[in-house]
Amino acid sequence: MLYKDIKVSHLMNSNDELQKLVKDFEAELWTLNFKKSVGSLDQSHKIRAIRRDIARIKTELNAREKGAK
């Protein structure tokens, strides 16, 4: 799932669901980085997109945390 799939509905999920999304993206990022180091990665643009998706979700989580205080 790349940024195109992260819509407002995903950002309206609970914090637990967003944290699960972050873990899923981090696992996928790890896999892509491993493939990159081995030399079998064909779509290197996905690494950048997933890193940005993780940042977007974490930004939303931090905004919620600061808003709750």
From Swiss-Prot:
It holds the Pfam family Ribosomal_L29. SUPFAM superfamilies: Ribosomal protein L29 (L29p) (SSF46561). One of its GO terms (cellular component) is ribosome. GO terms for molecular function: structural constituent of ribosome. Keywords: Ribonucleoprotein, Ribosomal protein. GO terms for biological process: translation. HAMAP family: Ribosomal_uL29. Belongs to the universal ribosomal protein uL29 family. NCBIfam families: L29. This is Large ribosomal subunit protein uL29. It comes from Mycoplasmopsis agalactiae (strain NCTC 10123 / CIP 59.7 / PG2) (Mycoplasma agalactiae). The gene is rpmC.
